[in-house]
């Protein structure tokens, strides 16, 4: 069963970020890290974390596991559906969700577009990170 649930500290112990997420952190000059488990949610498959994410106000984020690429087409559609449900829940609280994505993370850019992200001609870190926003009905 795939679900989004509160993150447990043990999720971090078994979670390995996907290659592009590691490269994105390096492009930002940091090591992949997470806030406290109490500030995160986990998208899990039978308890195994496929993605860990959350928000700081209207700034949203998700880091995917190195196992997501192994999902069947049906499981990938369920993953997307759950992310969209979480997006909708956040859009009940905030008019706009936003963040910056590393321009080299093409798989996340493609995914973000499928869930309604709009990319703006606004960049940070010498053009390496591009602003995206997600709005209701956007």
UniProtKB/Swiss-Prot annotation:
InterPro entries on file: Phage_T7_Gp13
Pfam families listed in its UniProt record: Phage_T7_Gp13 (PF11090)
Domain of life assignment: Viruses
Known role: May act as an organizer for the correct association of several proteins in the surrounding of the head-tail connector protein gp8.
Protein name per UniProt: Probable scaffold protein gp13
Organism: Escherichia phage T7 (Bacteriophage T7)
